[in-house]
Amino acid sequence: MNEVLFGSKNAERVLIYIYSRREGYAREIARFYDTDLKSIQNQLDKMEAGGVLVRREVGRTRPYTFNPRYSLLEELKGLLEKAFSFYPMNLRQELVMNRPGPNAKDSSS
């Protein structure tokens, strides 16, 4: 939808995913969009090198989040908010639905 602004479809996917879920890691993002893991990892690496994203170590995963020190963060989030509003409702709902982690307990038992 906005690949022209973001540079590529996968760059847009990475940014929208992290915008809507607050964080994400390469395999999770690639799986969500059913796309190539290497392409997503390349985008994450570029955005980390450019200071847009930061990565932290959590066990064996390395989730990425927006870099709070990125000088255009508020403007970027405003643009992403607007872009997100044009996504189909079903995709927006899937993006904001947070799945429990692998060690989460089922509270219904």
Task: Please name every model-derived segment.
Residues 44-45:
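Short, hydrophobic-biased segments on the C-terminal half of alpha helices
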